[in-house]
């Protein structure tokens, strides 16, 4: 397993007093499941089937890392296994990036669009699986990231091979976040042995509390 370096950071932003169903983090707003916009999507019958039922905290670990270490190339971004898409939404809002939000489950996109609307941005939706992402799909991508995307044994190879293709395609920065599941570390071992990179321990406290690890590869 790659060695972990642990860094602790604190998010000081406070949730809006006007809306207790929202959290604020690094300049974006994140709705709880009880927020009216999320309830409206659920009432419309959209039910994600691959764990896309909430905002996962590994996305916040990635946002915090990117906030502190902004890549030079950040115009075009791919959010792989996006779920509700908050990391890509943050990139669109913070940097004005063109974001492609990718997920195998089309039912996540109404939720993502609701979150994007709350933040005053939009992203391009792409229904796709990791193993189907081709090298040519990645050739114009500056940053590829994914939060909580390696949660099953059968995802280890597809995620690792997607990263292989991203590196071959010249993607500049790759960041994968996870609460340190064994499957994440198995994938990270495969990738770092082949391409280098590092696994960083990362922690947030404050408005969002989260602990996990980030696989970071710089390919510029």
Please identify what each model-predicted range represents.
Residues 1-220:
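S-adenosylmethionine-dependent methyltransferases
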């Amino acid at each position: 397993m790659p060695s972990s370096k642990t860094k602790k950071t604190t998010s000081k932003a406070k949730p809006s007093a006007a809306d207790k169903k929202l959290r604020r983090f690094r300049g974006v707003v994140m709705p709880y499941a009880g927020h009216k916009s999320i309830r409206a999507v659920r009432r419309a019958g959209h039910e994600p089937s691959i764990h896309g039922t909430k905002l996962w905290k590994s996305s916040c670990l990635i946002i915090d890392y990117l906030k502190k270490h902004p890549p030079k190339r950040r115009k075009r971004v791919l959010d792989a296994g996006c779920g509700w898409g908050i990391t890509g939404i943050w990139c669109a809002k913070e940097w004005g990036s063109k974001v492609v939000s990718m997920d195998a489950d089309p039912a996540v996109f109404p939720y993502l669009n609701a979150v994007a609307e709350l933040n005053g941005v939009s992203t391009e939706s792409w229904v796709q699986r990791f193993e189907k992402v081709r090298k040519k799909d990645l050739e114009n991508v500056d940053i590829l990231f994914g939060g909580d995307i390696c949660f099953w044994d059968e995802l280890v190879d597809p995620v690792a091979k997607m990263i292989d293709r991203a590196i071959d395609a010249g993607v500049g920065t790759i960041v994968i976040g996870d609460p340190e599941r064994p499957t994440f570390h198995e994938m990270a071992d495969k990738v770092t042995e082949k391409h280098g990179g590092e696994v960083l321990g990362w922690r947030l406290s404050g408005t969002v509390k989260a602990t996990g690890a980030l696989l970071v590869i710089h390919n510029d």
